[in-house]
Amino acid sequence: MNEATKRTIVKEIDAILYEEHKVLDHGFIRVVDYMGSDSAIVQAARVSYGKGTKQISQDEALIKYLMRHHHTTPFEMCEIKFHVKLPIFVARQWIRHRTANVNEYSARYSILDNEFYTPKPEQVAKQSDNNKQGSGEAFDPDTSKEIIDSLINDSNLVYSHYEKFIEQGLAREIARTNLMLNYYTQFYWKIDLHNLLHFLKLRADKHAQYEIRVYAEVMLDIIKKWVPLAYNAFVEYCLESACISRTGLEIIRKLIKGENVTREESNIGKREWGELMSILDKQS
């Protein structure tokens, strides 16, 4: 508790307030404000039966219990506000998480800078053969360079047209429409901890698109500083855990007993079987 402000503060977060954490080639994320800490979570959980502050070890055990049993309300007592600069196509994925408050830079009122995202060669990949919305293996260096050069040339070309439209007096709300999705935008994004952790579980996953995953990874480091007990529980029970179906559990029990189990007799789909075998470090 800070005596001057009469509110709980987290020194590790105060130390990085407004500090830009660089992401991608022109992007960043920074903490603008926050409310609450690990203590706010346990305080909310204990209010129903009037218990006061406990020892750290007891707080940690309670937070693990809440996370393990999906008691979400106490985690909603903490909130954090970010200022994010990111490519428009990343922002469109990001904004699908509708449980936050957001206000975005408006190209109706302001002129966008000539800043666009250019992928690194290793990120210029072919369409995945088994994932309709994901990337597969990278192109050869020559093809990657050709694609990147085209992206850069196209981006510069449309921006030159955008500038010409503005000079001609075209309304900004129309002039912006020819800009590509790799141009950068900015927004303020405020969210409670429960919904933030859900966002991070999806976007920090190895299957998430690289360009949004790198933002999520920076946010994970920030969460670790802000609410370390909740962060550890999240990693333990959500981020690095596995969801296994009833049938999957039956298969595991049989394997523990030394029984031979096949996918066909288990009545389980190929994809789920492969995921289960991957979890168990067994060949499918």
Curated annotation (Swiss-Prot):
Enzyme class of the recorded protein, top EC level: transferase
- Reaction(s) catalysed by this chain's protein: dUMP + (6R)-5,10-methylene-5,6,7,8-tetrahydrofolate + NADPH + H(+) = dTMP + (6S)-5,6,7,8-tetrahydrofolate + NADP(+)
Q: Where does FAD bind?
A: T73, R96, H97, R98, E104, D192, L193, H194, H198
Domain ThyX, chain residue ranges per copy: 27-237
UniProt keyword annotation of NADP present: yes
Q: Where does the source fall among the domains of life?
A: Bacteria
Required co-factor(s) are:
FAD
Q: Ranges of Polar residues compositional bias? A: 125-134
State the pathway, as annotated in the record.
Pyrimidine metabolism; dTTP biosynthesis
Q: What does this protein do?
A: Catalyzes the reductive methylation of 2'-deoxyuridine-5'-monophosphate (dUMP) to 2'-deoxythymidine-5'-monophosphate (dTMP) while utilizing 5,10-methylenetetrahydrofolate (mTHF) as the methyl donor, and NADPH and FADH(2) as the reductant.
Subunit field text:
Homotetramer.
The identity of this protein, by name, is Flavin-dependent thymidylate synthase
Native species of this protein? Answer: Wolbachia pipientis wMel
| Highest classification ranks of the organism | Bacteria, Pseudomonadati, Pseudomonadota, Alphaproteobacteria, Rickettsiales
